[in-house]
Every structure is written in structure tokens, then in C-alpha cells.
């Protein structure tokens, strides 16, 4: 029976006989003495095989990388000068008395310490990839975070309740993953995009504090921070307002960071309205580590001769912003061209700029092809508003507000994170949390000529905004809030609608008529009529949180068996074809299938 894990062997075990299990990480033959590094999920221990123990030594000669073995031996100090300070077990070694090969291994397709493996190779051989210390660290970190979340919520009276994985498809949100019903021919379940409706009905049922750590599913195009199946810390409460809800879950995140990583997050988290975030940063999830902000110049540029600025400044739904970069006047033409190409990804047609050489000289101290098209009053106001100093550069965005926000917002982050930005003090590092509140309830879809829910259609309007649901939905502000950390949205929630008549108004604003609302959400509308309490909640993306805490490059590095950006599992070959018999049982016939 194992006495301890390999990474736990230390001076405390000196003179003791231990039994260890694990995998051969490396084998070395030094002058007749064989050494192996034995590895398990806790770390390494050095095992010594002396030729005086002929049986154990003979077995050791057959060992190769990734053999699974057990050893029993005596813990002793390593010889003087051979200690390894990088290992927890680095002061000691185990003199093997007995060794058993539990299972041999074929030659692995790669060395576990190879840092240049392609992601395809790693995901295809995920079983071996997960043996790598960094991956084991990531999954242990994930486990520890989950444990601390549960401890925190349990202490506050939250109840872990499971909700269905097979549920009803609804028209709002991302594409559903559909599951055909064999018993009910022609009908389909959907895998849940979130437990949203079930947790609201749990509130109606009287379970006033609910949570679960659960899988959710969305059939959408993947990005670096997205997976078709992802894990959510899902929470809901009754009888609390949005401020009280934020306090509870801010406390949860602070607790997790302190206990797991010994990081003290600020108290309290700053709060910013959605409108302010978009005005200052062009993003509803601003990275506050970057010390750069927009300066709105729309009102100043209405009468300038530069048509790009004047047109944007006088067109509804457009804006002109300036981004002052301290010390950026030293940027080369090639660097500016690279940034111009970068903002083009976000729809910007160009990137105007002005270099500030000498503020005291006014127009003559400013360097740019566009200076001649801006009158003196506009230039003076630009310098005043931005606080520009000698040696700065000012970039501009002038277009539809969405293009400006996306392009210059991304430029802000790119410059801040660049080598230049860090040297110039434009990036402060650390952890910068933020609550973004007061989101619009609706976004207008030009193609469909209707409003869509900015979060989801069950979010409550702010007090005094209920009348806008019928008169002017675009003005309605929601009791919604997102928790943002270092430019990532790690959690989002809202106070929910708990009155049936208000929910029906929201459906009408979304052009969901009474018949469709009854068909899709009748169970919710009915539940709200039985004394539904005021309630609200939040959901956190566990995968995102772990990615940040681990400093991982991809969300796939913190999930045991992730999908690729084509939503495939390279380990198992999923998704895969199924045989005709299975399809017939499900009453499904395939047609016009394009093989990719």
C-alpha cells in the first residue's frame, strides 16, 4: 500500500521505509548505479538502484520512460552537493529494496518536457499530455477553486441542486445542441445553454439560495476563450437586490483568490456603468491594467475640413475619439503602419495620428498630414482634453460607434500590452477587477429589424424603466451586472423579472407574440403567477477563471478533454458517424451531407 506520494517525500521521512507508485520520468545509469526519477501528480522523487540488490537492479535495467511501477525503499539524504533545490523532495532519495513493473509502456510519441509540441499533437495524445506537470497543476488548481467555491457558498446557506441536461429548445441566444427523442418521434431535446429557467423556477419553489457547478452547451463558432461545452458556477438568490447580490459574489471571488493563490483583491471592486465603460474604453469589459483612455472629440470635429472626422462627428450613431499614448512620439512609421493594419481587422478604414513635438508651438509643434485640415481651436481643444505632452502620439478613431469602440479599444489594449507599453508605464499589471452595471436591456438587430435581448429576455428593467418596454425599448436599462477581471468577463448576472405581466411586455418588445411566448415559455409564465419572489443571480465561467489564475495561453489548457476550434475531440474522434440502424431508431434520415 502506498505510504505517500512521490512529491511528498522529504527530510521528515529520513530512515523510513516508503512505498511509492508512479511513472518513470527518466532513467540514468551512472557508473553501475541506476537512478530513476519517479513521477506522480505531486512531483518527482529520485530512486536509487544499487547492484548489491541484484533482483531490483535487474528490473531497473528494463525500465524505460512511462513504465508504471511501484517501489519500496529506504529514504536517505542525497550525497553532499547533489541536492536539487527545485524539487520538494530534492534533499533526499529512496534506496530501492523492491520494485514491480505494473505495466510497461511503448515508446511515447513525444517527450513530456518538450515545450514545442503542436496543439494537435497534444490533444490527439491527451492522455500523455495530461501527465505533464503544468497540465496536472492546472487541473489541480481547477479542483481547488471548485472546492473553495463550494465551501464559501455552503457557509452562506446555498444549496447545490442539479437541473436537467435534457431540456426544451428556446428561440433566444446561441444555437442549441439538439438531441433527438427516440420515444417521441420527430421531437427533440436541447442541451442547456444555461440552467437559467430552471434556477428561476427553483426560486419560485422556495429554494432561496441555489448553486451548482455545471456543464452548459452552445453550438457557436469557437474562439480562444470558447468551448462548445463549458463549466459554469451557476447561482441564484431570492429577496436580495442587485447590490446585495454583487456583495456576496464579489466576496466569493475574493475568497477564492486569497485561499488558492494568496492574492488580495481590492475591497470593494470599483463599479462603472456600461455607458461610461464604452465612452472611456470602447469596451464593456475594459482591461484596467492598461493606463490609456479614450478622449471623446466628437463635438469638436464637426466643423473641421478633414472629412473623415467631420462626417463621423455629424452622423448619428458615430463618434470621434482620441487615444493619447504617452511617449509614443518615438514610434516609427513601420510601427504605426502595423497598428493601422491591426485596427483594420475591426473594420477601421485607417488610423489617423498626430505626433506632439512641442506643445508650446501650437500648430507648428504638431506633426501629421491631417494637421493642416484641423483649425486652431480644434487642435487647442485636442491638446487640452487629452493632456498631451511633448513626445506623445495621439491616435484617432472616426466612424460608426461600434467600429471606433472595437478598433480603438483593441488598439488601446495592444499598445498597453506591448513591449513599448510596459516600458512606458502604460501597463500596471496585477489584478484589476471591475463591476460593469446598467447595461441596455436590448440591442437593435438591423438585419432582422427588431430588438434582441442584450443579456437574456428574463432580465428585469431598472426601476422607472418598465414603461420603456412598450414605448421605446432602446431606452430601457437593465438591472444587469458583469464582473470583469483584467479585460475578461468572468461572470454575468442580473435581477430577474418576477412578475408575469412584465415578462410578457419584454416578450412583446422582442416581437415574440403571445402564442409563441406561451409555446416556448408557458411553464415560466405560469410559474410567475404563483407568488414568485423577487430574485436574481449570476453565473461565472469556471474555465475562464482557471485560465487566468493559471496564466494559461488557452482555455483548452485548463480543461481535461477539450474540443478544438472545429468542435472536435482529437482523442476520441468525436463527433463521429453513426450507423444507419441508430438513425432509423431515431427516425432521422441524412441528406445532402457535405463531408469535410
Swiss-Prot record:
Any GO BP annotation: aspartyl-tRNA aminoacylation
Q: What is this protein's function per UniProt?
A: Aspartyl-tRNA synthetase with relaxed tRNA specificity since it is able to aspartylate not only its cognate tRNA(Asp) but also tRNA(Asn). Reaction proceeds in two steps: L-aspartate is first activated by ATP to form Asp-AMP and then transferred to the acceptor end of tRNA(Asp/Asn).
Which InterPro entries does the UniProt record give?
Answer: Aa-tRNA-synt_II (IPR004364), aa-tRNA-synth_II (IPR006195), aa-tRNA-synth_II/BPL/LPL (IPR045864), Asp-tRNA-ligase_1 (IPR004524), Asp-tRNA-ligase_1_N (IPR047089), Asp/Asn-tRNA-synth_IIb (IPR002312), AspRS_core (IPR047090), GAD-like_sf (IPR004115)
Where's it mainly located? cytoplasm
**Site (described: Important for tRNA non-discrimination):** 30, 81
- Protein name (Swiss-Prot/TrEMBL): Aspartate--tRNA(Asp/Asn) ligase
Residues binding ATP: 218-220, 227, 489, 541-544
How does this chain assemble? Homodimer.
Q: Which GO terms describe its cellular component?
A: cytoplasm
Catalytic EC class? ligase
GO molecular function (one): aspartate-tRNA(Asn) ligase activity
- Where does it localize? Cytoplasm
Keywords assigned by UniProt?
Aminoacyl-tRNA synthetase, ATP-binding, Cytoplasm, Ligase, Nucleotide-binding, Protein biosynthesis
Reaction catalysed by this chain?
tRNA(Asx) + L-aspartate + ATP = L-aspartyl-tRNA(Asx) + AMP + diphosphate
Query: Which residue ranges are recorded for the region named Aspartate?
Result: 196-199
Record Gene3D superfamilies = Bira Bifunctional Protein, Domain 2 (3.30.930.10), GAD-like domain (3.30.1360.30), Nucleic acid-binding proteins (2.40.50.140)
Q: Kindly list the positions annotated as binding L-aspartate.
A: 172, 218, 455, 496
- EC number(s) recorded for this UniProt protein: 6.1.1.23
